């Protein structure tokens, strides 16, 4: 469709976007029909280049700091205008989409991209509504101009690229970045700011539902198992990464999945494997000479990705919504090999571990990270995406758990028998067996043992799991060394938690240093 002096393609179809991407040299087709695109040096998020405009309507509610860096309103206006001028004579792709599957809590967003494959990504990951903006809400705007080069001296940025959120003007600007994940995480941050004011808990989690309508949530950082474990052939997928929990139910914030591809196999992850086909975007995946994706190849990045719409998954919840969850799973990847494979948490322990967000960066999604696996504390299991103070989200979680009676579990998808490099990682079948026991209700009111240093209750038996694995000390050859590592981990928890202003009941729910 012609628009002024240049071409603007409104609400283009998947086939059109794939065709444009190929014609414009943006990507290549794989043997399985997916489109491969490369992002260059920035093959992950750029947290050092993410800003929020500091303006009166939101200033008091944002936790400013290294995660939420402030940007001046005047500088934003100038940069937005420069990017618009830069795009004025370019071929562009535009879609009217929504973020949030709930009819009350959605946000309408117009996405404008310079690249066809970025538009395909947006249409895969956001929601394509039957009727756009049926409640006539003010519309958000995303502009994504990957070939625009920021000038820190002129633009007030930290580098040649920037991601800037403006809550007052409902604008998201992405400039100088090809990594498509920045688009989805920007709108996630927007909803993470807006939803608490509506009494809704936004969550960095996946969700699925059983045949009887029982919902399970899986919280966790990238690479800890959210996508893999929620893609369960026995259950229906609601979503793999971002959800809202309102009184009465949960809803997907997105319309698609952004699955990690490194070491992907048909045997271990059949649902994801089958979803990668025509219309899917593969980011930084290497192909062989026959165009067959090599999912073991991390030469471009550990953070290889597949972006596909939920419609690529046969067993999905059509409306992207579910009942309130009976089971909530916190996925932690423990590199010290100390935590048990599953623990049953009280509501105070749930708040403690939600605020702590102890886990590891596995094949990190951030640029500049090596393939080395490092332990980290990431508040709410997603610190980079939550603009408000952590206590706001923890209070909402406690409220929802209490009002519905959800049971929370801590599941370690990391190491046992020793730290990373010495012990071995729990295999996917073991973790799946634990999750099966959780969703079936098997672990409610079971006999447990108490691990004193970690202050955790561990079931003595889980169907399909070697009972020797359940108490982690059993898997260590050197029991004294295990006790030493457990004490070190408890001290790390205590030190990290000191910054939170919480009740004694929550503070005492953590490990005992």
Curated annotation (Swiss-Prot):
Record InterPro entries: PEP_carboxykinase_ATP, PEP_carboxykinase_C, PEP_carboxykinase_N, PEPCK_ATP_CS
EC number from the UniProt entry: 4.1.1.49
Biological processes, Gene Ontology terms: gluconeogenesis
Keyword Nucleotide-binding recorded: yes
Residues annotated for substrate binding in this entry: 45, 179, 185, 305
A family per Pfam: PEPCK_ATP
Localization per Swiss-Prot or TrEMBL: Cytoplasm
Name of the protein in question: Phosphoenolpyruvate carboxykinase (ATP)
Species annotation: Shewanella putrefaciens (strain CN-32 / ATCC BAA-453)
